[in-house]
Amino acid sequence: MITNTAAYQFAPIHDPQQLADSVLERAQQRALKGSVLVAEEGINLFLAGDAEQIAGFYAWLHADARFAQMRVKYSHSAEQPFARLKVKVKPEIISFRRDDASPLQGRAPSVAPAMLRKWMQQGHDDHGRPLVLLDTRNAQEVAYGTFQGALTLPIDKFTELPEALQPHRAALADATVVSFCTGGIRCEKAALWMHAEGMDNVLQLEGGILGYFEDVGGEGYDGRCFVFDERVALDAELRPLGDGAACADAGKI
């Protein structure tokens, strides 16, 4: 059985290449595969391997004060979902190209999965404001599943979100908006940008869809959650698609 992990942390990294080299060395020593991006704004990891080796790797990474609070989301599969290990240094750990959306300058308010489930059951937040769930993922991912009634955007890349959202801004003004994505990283940047744009009614879903599945299951969610590896998509119990479905992006890192 393979242990799969997804994790990220925004933190100042003064020498991204040095960190990338250390991560590569430690991951290789433990025969892990997957994708790691390092930038001056933080680290983004998708790693898979033997459970004991995964635990050892994250114990090492958590010992670094910059990543001590980093949440790791776990799932399991019968096969290794990654073909190789790649560790890269990039300008951003998720490309958004907006100077006013830097998590190093602060963090947008968040909502825990259990609270979001409660709000969805109620149809509004605890102040009676209508609830809008904003899917910040691209159209290919949304096709596999999303939250019931979510606002989805016709985008192919995350950088297209600001323009695609413009026609909806007036309609969102009187609602509590919860941005969400796969694991939390995109919705964190999206929520920050929206706050910078004057939309102070925006929250981010803590841990993203995978965190929601892990904490409370699939209530209020239709379908599966697309992932960028050979598992293709996960159900609410974090099980891979497993039906032989293929995807052009599956397994690419």
UniProtKB/Swiss-Prot annotation:
Keywords: Oxidoreductase, tRNA processing. This is tRNA uridine(34) hydroxylase. GO terms for molecular function: oxidoreductase activity, acting on paired donors, with incorporation or reduction of molecular oxygen. Its EC number is 1.14.-.-. It comes from the Bacteria. Catalyzes oxygen-dependent 5-hydroxyuridine (ho5U) modification at position 34 in tRNAs. It is an enzyme of class 1 (oxidoreductase). Belongs to the TrhO family. Residues 127-221 form the Rhodanese domain. GO terms for biological process: tRNA modification. It catalyses: uridine(34) in tRNA + AH2 + O2 = 5-hydroxyuridine(34) in tRNA + A + H2O. The gene is trhO.
